[in-house]
């Protein structure tokens, strides 16, 4: 059915019934025909006015466009006359700063919409019957939809077509994304390489230093190197300890309970409490060196040490005799070192001051719980060979284990400044302080928050790109064509599945 834009009334000039009682019928028909012609002329004049009005509007729009184009041409003509290529060159910066001309074509669309309806069609539309007043039922609906749209909806077909086009465009985009991911997976399938374990070169060289038949077990070597692995990993304090121990070459025991092998010689009973208390603090600050630990692990036989020097008089023994500075012995070993069944202890060797022995403070000496005499004396250890050039004293071969000594005298651990309350206070762990709020401490949180905000912002930008710019046919079709024929997948970087969590 064609849509009539302009209709001329009346359509029939001479068609009509003559009234009764007319004497001259010919004159009546002529007059009615002339009146119909006049009405048609008036209708034509009205349509002519509408047509010329539309032509005037079109001509006015054309004049505006031509005028703007003429203004641009005039400005270009002025610039061309002022530009002298022989004097001044056009800089690339000026060219890059200005955008190139791009024509924006306006496509004709929504011709039959209510806004673009011409006046004759609007008149015909107004003459038609009105729909029933179903819009008064809209406030009573739960879904808040317009009640008139269930009877007549001018945008129904457009909305249906728009939904279908957008769904097809989204399906095309997902298909391209799936193909792109499939190509990426096919291109990146390669063998996963295993990470090579780091090697400890120093430990390997230490193992190679021994003969094949004398190399220690892996477990022993790991425990030894756990206590003192290498010189490069020791602190300056530990290096000074090891230097002192190697200089005096006294028997040393590792810090492990299974490798503690004390030597238990016998001495007089009167000197046991004195020497056990005076040297208990001094022996605690030293740790066994790696060299002595290796000797303990290997259990290699050593030559017996030279006999001790002659015994000092009884009068000067109580004031001058001091236990040898065995840096690796435990308190129980020192007490057993001077048992009541042997000769009195020998005088100490000359002390060589070092960075650790010259300045000793009570707080720097860690305390160790003494082992029982019965458990310690179960594993005897042969004495080590003394270093050349230094006088070293060592106990004779081990004998039967003596009974554990009694409680020390009044000048025992309680009166020693090394084992007083300051040591317990220094041993007590300090309470954890609350973390100080600093800008640097919040750097990681700020970075994470910035990344999250950036992701959300990019997601919103991509969602804005997905939405059509205009709610019209041309924009929707252009976007679908762009998705089908484009090689890039910029609009589909962020999938809704990636943001579901």
UniProtKB/Swiss-Prot annotation:
GO molecular function: actin binding
Bias (Basic and acidic residues) ranges: 182-192
Biased composition regions of type Pro residues, renumbered to the chain: 302-312, 341-352, 394-410
PROSITE patterns: WH2
Region Disordered, annotated ranges: 170-443
Low complexity bias (residue ranges): 411-422
Keyword DNA-binding: no
KW Metal-binding (keyword) present: no
An annotated GO BP: lamellipodium assembly
Major localisation: cytoplasm
Function: Downstream effector molecules involved in the transmission of signals from tyrosine kinase receptors and small GTPases to the actin cytoskeleton. Plays a role in the regulation of cell morphology and cytoskeletal organization. Required in the control of cell shape.
Domain notes: Binds the Arp2/3 complex through the C-terminal region and actin through verprolin homology (VPH) domain.
Name recorded for this polypeptide: Actin-binding protein WASF3
């Amino acid at each position: 059915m064609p849509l009539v834009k302009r209709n001329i009334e009346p359509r029939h000039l001479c068609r009509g019934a003559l009234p009764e009682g007319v004497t001259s019928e010919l004159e009546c028909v002529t007059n009615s025909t002339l009146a119909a012609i006049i009405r048609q002329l008036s209708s034509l004049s009205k349509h002519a006015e509408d047509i010329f009005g539309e032509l005037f509007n079109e001509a006015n729009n054309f004049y505006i466009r031509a005028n703007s184009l003429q203004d641009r041409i005039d400005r270009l003509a002025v610039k061309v006359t002022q530009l002298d290529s022989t004097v001044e060159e056009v800089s690339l910066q000026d060219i890059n700063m200005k955008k190139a001309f791009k024509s924006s074509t306006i496509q004709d669309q929504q011709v039959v919409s209510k806004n673009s309806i011409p006046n004759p069609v609007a008149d015909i539309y107004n003459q038609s019957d009105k729909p029933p007043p179903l819009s008064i039922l809209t406030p009573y609906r739960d879904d808040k939809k317009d009640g008139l749209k269930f009877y007549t909806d001018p945008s129904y077909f457009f909305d249906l077509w728009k939904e279908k086009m957008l769904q097809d465009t989204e399906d095309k985009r997902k298909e391209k994304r799936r193909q792109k991911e499939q190509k990426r997976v096919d291109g990146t399938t390669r063998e996963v390489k295993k990470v090579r374990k780091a090697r400890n070169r120093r430990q390997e060289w230490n193992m190679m230093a021994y003969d094949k038949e004398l190399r220690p077990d892996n477990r022993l070597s790991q425990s030894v190197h756990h206590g003192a692995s290498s010189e490069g990993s020791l602190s300056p304090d530990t290096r000074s300890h090891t230097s002192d121990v190697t200089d005096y070459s006294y028997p040393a025991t590792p810090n492990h309970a299974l490798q503690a092998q004390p030597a238990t010689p016998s001495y007089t009973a009167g000197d046991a409490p004195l020497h056990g208390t005076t040297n208990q603090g001094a022996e605690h600050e030293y740790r066994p060196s790696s060299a002595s630990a290796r000797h303990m692990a290997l259990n290699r036989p050593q030559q017996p040490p030279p006999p001790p020097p002659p015994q000092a008089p009884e009068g000067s023994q109580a004031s001058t005799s001091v236990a040898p500075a065995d840096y690796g012995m435990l308190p129980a070993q020192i007490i057993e070192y001077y048992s009541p069944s042997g000769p009195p202890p020998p005088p100490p060797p000359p002390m060589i001051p070092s960075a650790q022995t010259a300045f000793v403070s009570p707080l720097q000496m860690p305390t160790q719980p003494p082992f029982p005499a019965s458990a310690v004396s179960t594993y005897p250890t042969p004495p080590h060979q003394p270093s050349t050039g230094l006088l070293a004293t060592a106990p004779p071969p081990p004998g039967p284990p003596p009974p554990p000594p009694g409680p020390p005298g009044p000048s025992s651990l309680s009166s020693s400044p090394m084992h007083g309350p300051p040591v317990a206070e220094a041993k007590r762990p300090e309470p954890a302080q609350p973390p100080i709020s600093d800008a640097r401490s919040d750097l990681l949180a700020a970075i994470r928050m910035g990344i999250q905000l950036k992701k959300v912002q990019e997601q919103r930008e991509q969602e804005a790109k997905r939405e059509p710019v205009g709610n019209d046919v041309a924009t929707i079709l252009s976007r679908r064509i762009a998705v089908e024929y484009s090689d890039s997948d910029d609009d589909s970087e962020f999938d809704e599945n990636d943001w579901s969590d």
